[in-house]
Amino acid sequence: MMNESQPKLKYKRILLKFSGEALMGKSQFGIDPSVLDSLARDIAELIHMGVEVGLVLGGGNLFRGKALSQAGVGRVTGDHMGMLATVMNALALRDALERIDLPARIMSAIPMLGVVDPYHRRKAITHLRNGQVVIFAAGTGNPFFTTDTAACLRAIEIGADIVLKATKVDGVYSADPLKNSDAKRYDYLTYKEVLTKGLEVMDSTAICLCQDQGMPLQVFDMAAPKALKRIVTGERVGTIVGANHDQ
């Protein structure tokens, strides 16, 4: 519940996209419990400010389809396995949230009776309004679509104000800043600029979906101090992608 002493919110309902790789921390595989706990605390701070939080997690920390594809596993099978990996991550995050007494629901695009709830748009919105964190799992439920696209789709469906993509760098660059010291970081980009420049913000399907529906994106470094709190109160952190540079 927000009180008068708290800062004014620019974004009341957000969709946070968190990669599976980010959950590994400094490990090469799996889930780092300290990363989960840190993410849970950051989300709790937003909930206590009155922000409604939906999440989509990737699955790259538990499953890497490229290696299996090279071994002959079909793309559809690999994508389904990746969807299951996102459910595993969602279960871990829900547990971390519940350990700090923050109610959370998992809604999966693939029905898993007795494990998680099936995705239902209207119920998801009700949960958000009631102060529960909603974790959307299993992508879109269809192969050939990334979790970035799933995040944008769910954000549009639930009427989120913005999609926040947490990464390991502080925004979008013209080139890989780890390989090119001349790489330029952008403060603002339009959807068209992202597509024409071939910038690695999200896949083109996700960007086009946001462009068609006017859904803004913000790419930021999850390790930046109080990043989420600063963003929801209107501070520019990282790179903003929208219809124009005045987003």
UniProtKB/Swiss-Prot annotation:
This protein's record includes keyword Cytoplasm: yes
Record's catalysed reaction(s): UMP + ATP = UDP + ADP
Bilayer-crossing regions: none
Name the UniProt record assigns to this protein: Uridylate kinase
Protein family: Belongs to the UMP kinase family.
Residues that, per the record, bind ATP: K17, F18, S19, G20, G60, R64, T167, Y173, D176
Upper lineage: Bacteria, Pseudomonadati, Pseudomonadota, Gammaproteobacteria, Legionellales
Organism of derivation: Legionella pneumophila subsp. pneumophila (strain Philadelphia 1 / ATCC 33152 / DSM 7513)
The keyword Translocase appears for this protein: no
Enzyme Commission number(s) of this protein: 2.7.4.22
Superkingdom per UniProt: Bacteria
Pathway this chain belongs to: Pyrimidine metabolism; CTP biosynthesis via de novo pathway; UDP from UMP (UMPK route): step 1/1
Gene behind the chain: pyrH
GO CC list: cytosol
CDD domains referenced in this protein's UniProt entry, alphabetically: AAK_UMPK-PyrH-Ec
